[in-house]
Swiss-Prot record:
PANTHER family, per the entry: L-SERYL-TRNA(SEC) SELENIUM TRANSFERASE (PTHR32328:SF0)
Cofactor: pyridoxal 5'-phosphate
Protein name according to UniProt: L-seryl-tRNA(Sec) selenium transferase
Gene name of the encoded protein: selA
UniProt-annotated location(s): Cytoplasm
This protein's pathway: Aminoacyl-tRNA biosynthesis; selenocysteinyl-tRNA(Sec) biosynthesis; selenocysteinyl-tRNA(Sec) from L-seryl-tRNA(Sec) (bacterial route): step 1/1
InterPro entries per the UniProt record, alphabetical: PyrdxlP-dep_Trfase (IPR015424), PyrdxlP-dep_Trfase_major (IPR015421), SelA-like (IPR018319), SelA_trans (IPR004534), SelA_trans_N_dom (IPR025862)
NCBIfam families: selA
Keywords associated with the record: Cytoplasm, Protein biosynthesis, Pyridoxal phosphate, Selenium, Transferase
Length: 462
């Protein structure tokens, strides 16, 4: 059939509305939703005809496409996905998962009124930051603390407060890009601090900082390169040395440690990552870090340090523009409470638990998943193998965590097609593909995910 005839054969919306199945959907949904979905279905087939992708279709085809479109239009765009990649802090999949206590706290303050900015003791207006400041001080040892909506905002606010219109000295090797094309030099520019780069990419000495200090210097800045490592012929100035230099010239020292861990992972066999507590113990005046990376909480930028500097930041006009909402505060409070006892934090905060759980546990879990798949899914090959998980989220670069995975292949469908179908399924499952095999890393899977994975695999060849 020629293109013109195919276009003429496209049904009209009024015609489709008379179809029994469409009428049934019309009774259950708004007319606007049904008509919009019908229009999308007709437009889809018109486009396919114009592209010469089809040479025939039926009214039933158009109606079936309408049904799929309507269901998609009804569903929320923000979906739950199953993370089978083995990347624990997966930036694109929402980073850290919240602890149960944090989730319960969010629900409580979301479905009820709360004392967000109300002092129950005095019966007067209070500060939203008071709900978490004491907790942050307790778990970090800081004199004072405040929270904004993300770590880039924390860096910008701190720099704007400490050295607006003045110079911030930083090592050239620490001018990191923190993701999404957001770069430390750009954040500094918006803070209205003037960047002074010192040293080289791989080597910076104390004299590089000292030789650039002048009457217009506002802060000495150290940025932890949490999302990359420079190996080989390298040297950087320690926090202790910078604090001594800052004291000599009466300049504040600020450190952005990015991923913001409160746990010393070297105790558990990982490469040492600077903790918030260690930076403060070394005398750093202001430390900034993220809430949704190694901390395992909600997206937030946490600022800790000397009270005189934090108090100035609280009064900065930028603070209102950067403040966090009640749900984030509730989630952060619930997360921080877990850190009063490190053992409790590791047990209850999913990010920490996933990173620190032993591979032997995951071997048994991988074997269980493989058995369920083998017992319920035909025409696929499943095997358990050793592999490596990643921390992710721009944290612990180069660190790999021994794990066990289920590897999948089939003679009837390619690994790439399996990946696509799982990703586009009703319950999206995100996997890795390597050497013509689909990889399901159980480190980032929950037991509740196993049945869903089995059900979605059963649909792959239908």
């Amino acid at each position: 059939m020629d293109k013109k005839q195919l276009l003429r054969n496209l049904p009209k919306i009024d015609e489709l509305l008379k179809e029994e199945i469409v009428n049934r959907y019309l009774q259950e949904n708004s007319r606007t939703l049904v008509v919009d979905s019908l229009r999308q279905s007709i437009d889809h087939y018109r486009g396919e005809i114009l592209k010469n992708n089809i040479d025939s279709f039926t009214k039933e085809n158009v109606v079936n496409y309408f049904i799929d479109t309507l269901e998609e239009n009804k569903s929320t765009k923000f979906k739950k996905v199953i993370n089978a990649t083995g990347v624990v802090i997966h930036t694109n999949l929402g980073r850290s998962l919240l602890a149960k206590e944090a989730i319960e706290n969010v629900i409580k303050v979301s479905e009820n009124y709360s004392n967000l900015e109300y002092d129950l003791k005095d019966g007067k207006r209070g500060s939203r930051y008071s709900h978490v400041e004491e907790l942050i001080k307790k778990v970090t040892g800081a004199e004072a603390a405040m929270v904004v909506n993300n770590n880039a905002a924390a860096v910008m606010l701190a720099l704007n407060t400490l050295c607006e219109g003045r110079e911030a000295i930083v090592s050239r090797g620490q001018l990191v890009e923190i993701g999404g094309s957001f770069r430390i030099p750009d954040v500094m520019k918006f803070s209205r601090a003037h960047l002074v780069e010192v040293g080289t990419t791989n080597r910076t000495h104390l004299y590089d900082y000292e030789n650039n200090i002048n009457e217009n210097t506002g802060v000495l800045l150290k940025v932890h390169t949490s999302n990359f490592k420079i190996m080989g012929f390298t040297e950087e100035v320690s926090s202790e040395e910078m604090v001594q230099l800052g004291g000599k010239y009466k300049l504040p020292v600020m450190e952005d440690i990015g991923s913001g861990t409160l746990v010393d992972f070297s105790k558990y066999g990982f490469t040492y990552e600077p903790t918030v507590q260690s930076s403060l113990e070394k005398g750093v005046d202001v430390v900034t870090f993220s809430g949704d990376k190694m901390l395992g909480g909600p997206q937030a930028g946490i600022i800790v340090g000397k009270k005189k500097y934090i108090d100035k930041m609280k009064k900065n006009q930028l603070t209102r523009a950067l403040r966090i909402d009640k749900m984030t505060l509730a989630a952060l409070e619930g997360t921080l409470k877990c850190y009063i006892d490190e053992k409790e934090a590791i047990e209850n905060i999913p990010t920490l638990n996933m990173i620190l759980s032993s591979k032997d546990i995951h071997k048994k879990r991988a074997q269980r998943l493989k058995r369920r798949l083998q017992n319920n899914v035909k025409d696929f090959n499943f095997k358990v193998s050793e592999d490596l998980s990643m921390v992710g989220g721009g944290s612990m670069p180069g660190e790999r965590i021994p794990t066990y995975v289920v590897k999948v292949n089939s003679d009837k469908i390619t690994a790439e097609k399996i990946e696509e179908k799982l990703r586009l399924s009703k319950n999206p499952i995100i996997v890795r593909v390597s050497k013509d095999e689909v990889i399901l890393d159980v480190r980032t899977l929950f037991e509740r995910d196993f049945n869903i994975i089995v059900e979605e695999f059963k649909k792959l060849l239908k």
